[in-house]
């Protein structure tokens, strides 16, 4: 029977920012790519799934939850001198992105005399609140009249769907998307010595940065795992502590654990096969310095698979690529993936 050696590593993975794209006036979307490595086999999947679920479900945000539009009879009515219907104005208010550092509940005001195009920048806010998309269109005033709206903003998680007919004190309910995280992707890439790297991509709406979202999500996960550390061996339900009951529970758990272990082993093989190729492994994992990294990018070399199609002599032919840069690439390939790049 063969012997297997498991290398138990005491160190923790290093997190780095691979790339970053800030939002523009036209598209309010922040993007960051994070790299966590080295991880033991299987850890990247555990980490990636947990972080993705947390970021998409539990990050707190702020949104407009109600609006009182002066002169509006009902949601589908119109106002003289206002181009949009009340319904369209409410939909536009729903897409206003709010940064809120402190306050949970607050009232805000729009009070503008036309003619004018009303944008999110026209919302009067307190010092602790700002708008991430100030150029977002709300309404068009076509006549010299006053357009006045009272807004209620609040903090929350997830998505709030409200009854459109539930109008209280003249306030129309506004469906609210609180979560500032718009999308999360992760991929797993094999390194040398049975280690893995996790690449995590996060998009946010500009209310918080992807880095802040990652920090908040990590804190939420930490709080989920803290309670077991306060348990002691004798803190169990003695009312259900009979010997027969304990034997039954142990047998049930043993059966479930054995079945679950088999399924997990099969899943791990599927995952390893899925990410075995280097065609989707970005060169960011090499952790190169700026010069060789930019040279590779300018030569349209984006993945490890692209790099392996070339030899060391081919790399020297790339513009601005010197011997020291090639040496750094060769050493990084060997260190991170156990790959020896061919000379010619």
Swiss-Prot record:
It catalyses: RNA(n) + a ribonucleoside 5'-triphosphate = RNA(n+1) + diphosphate. It is an enzyme of class 2 (transferase). The keyword rRNA-binding does not apply. Its EC number is 2.7.7.6. Keywords: Chloroplast, DNA-directed RNA polymerase, Nucleotidyltransferase, Plastid, Transcription, Transferase. Disulfide bonds: none annotated. Residues 1-232 are annotated as: Alpha N-terminal domain (alpha-NTD). GO terms for molecular function: DNA binding; DNA-directed RNA polymerase activity; protein dimerization activity. The keyword Transferase applies. It is found in: Plastid, Chloroplast. GO terms for cellular component: chloroplast; DNA-directed RNA polymerase complex; mitochondrion. DNA-dependent RNA polymerase catalyzes the transcription of DNA into RNA using the four ribonucleoside triphosphates as substrates. In plastids the minimal PEP RNA polymerase catalytic core is composed of four subunits: alpha, beta, beta', and beta''. When a (nuclear-encoded) sigma factor is associated with the core the holoenzyme is formed, which can initiate transcription. The N-terminal domain is essential for RNAP assembly and basal transcription, whereas the C-terminal domain is involved in interaction with transcriptional regulators and with upstream promoter elements. Belongs to the RNA polymerase alpha chain family. This is DNA-directed RNA polymerase subunit alpha.
């Amino acid at each position: 029977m063969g012997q297997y050696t498991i290398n138990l590593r005491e160190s923790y993975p290093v997190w780095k920012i691979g790339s970053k794209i800030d939002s523009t006036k036209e598209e309010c979307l922040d993007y960051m790519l994070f790299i966590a490595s080295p991880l033991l086999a299987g850890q990247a999947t555990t980490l990636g799934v947990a972080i993705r679920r947390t970021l998409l479900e539990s990050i707190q945000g702020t949104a407009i939850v109600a609006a009182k539009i002066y002169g509006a009879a009902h949601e589908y009515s119109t106002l003289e001198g206002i181009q949009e219907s009340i319904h369209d104005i409410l939909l536009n208010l729903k897409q206003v992105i709010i940064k809120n550092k402190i306050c949970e509940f607050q009232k805000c005001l729009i009070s503008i005399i036309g003619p004018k195009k009303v944008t999110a920048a026209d919302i009067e806010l307190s010092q602790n609140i700002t708008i991430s998309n100030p150029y977002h269109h709300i309404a068009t005033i076509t006549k010299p009249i006053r357009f006045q709206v009272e807004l209620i903003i609040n903090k929350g998680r997830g998505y709030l769907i409200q009854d459109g007919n539930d109008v209280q004190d003249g306030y129309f309910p506004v469906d609210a998307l609180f979560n500032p995280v718009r999308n999360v992707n992760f991929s797993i890439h094999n390194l040398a010595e049975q280690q893995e790297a996790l690449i995590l991509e996060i998009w946010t709406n500009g209310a918080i940065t992807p880095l802040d979202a990652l920090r908040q999500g990590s804190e939420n996960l930490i709080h989920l795992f803290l309670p077991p550390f306060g348990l002691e061996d004798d803190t169990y339900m003695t009312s259900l502590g009979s010997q027969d009951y304990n034997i039954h529970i142990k047998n049930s758990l043993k059966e479930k654990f054995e079945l679950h272990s088999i399924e997990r082993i099969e899943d791990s093989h599927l995952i390893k096969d899925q990410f075995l190729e280097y065609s989707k492994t970005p060169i960011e994992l090499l952790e190169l310095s700026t010069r060789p990294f930019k040279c590779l990018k300018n030569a349209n070399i984006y993945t490890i698979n692209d790099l392996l199609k070339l030899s060391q002599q081919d790399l020297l032919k790339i513009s601005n690529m010197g011997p020291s840069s090639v040496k750094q690439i060769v050493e990084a390939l060997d260190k991170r993936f156990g790959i020896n790049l061919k000379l010619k």
